[in-house]
Amino acid sequence: MRFLLCISLFLITAFAQQLGCFINESNQSIVFIKDGQIKNLDLKDTIYKNQECGNDGESFYIANLNNEIIEVTNEKNFLFAMPNVGCKISQIMAIKNKIYVACDMANEVSIGVFDKNLNKLLTKNYKDVYKISSFLPIDDELFFTSFNGKAFLLDKELNLKEKKRVGFAPLSACKFKENDILLGFRDGEILDFKSGIKKQVLKSKISALACMEDEIFIGDGDGVVYKFDKDLKLKGQKALFNNEIKRIFIDKGVLNGVNLDNEIKSLEINSF
């Protein structure tokens, strides 16, 4: 299966090893940020609504409607398929030759890790999970949360290391270099996963998070981005959209926000 591509978007999180992207159905492209600039990778075939995308800096990885993962460089190649019938891939992240995938089912989730070097797929199912709300590979481990208020930490073999109840509807998460994890909630609270300390920082819901060095950037349901220090003291805020921010990505000193309509707007980090 080969399709010519023309480069004419790359979303990157706060850490160089964690690259991201998303699918824009309206113009049939992969959207990403590179060197602080918004870019497009135009695909010469149909993109279906709500497809997921991952990126490791060399290739993009797209999930199709059959839960197959396709590697996209200058052509498209089949890599692997999740074995569960009836699940919906909701997360893809690619780091260090490994592709991490979450596939949602009714009150259950299937997690897969594909090692490109070994051409090997490892999958395990976890029950009593109602849809993945955040998904963070951490070194060789994997952290994820579900909308029904649970957080899971898995080892490199996908064995459960830790499971916590963290409160209703964690919507977003980010991590610092030392792997401290913060969770953002619908009610405007922030939770430090390691200490268990919660703090109310917004009156509106926290829909997106990005951690960078000693700073935290929060996107809310009204389209505003807030800048906090690591002690959760407010350092500034900027209106970016008129509706909910679903993702925040940072690259080269530029913050890029994505709203529910897949619009992208940028802010200089030092403008707060």
Describe each region flagged by the PLM.
Residues 18-27, 47-57, 86-94, 129-137, ...:
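Repeated scaffold domains used in trafficking and secretory/extracellular systems
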Residues 28, 36-37, 65-69, 106-109, ...:
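Loop/turn residues immediately N-terminal
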Residues 3-14:
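Sec-dependent N-terminal signal peptides
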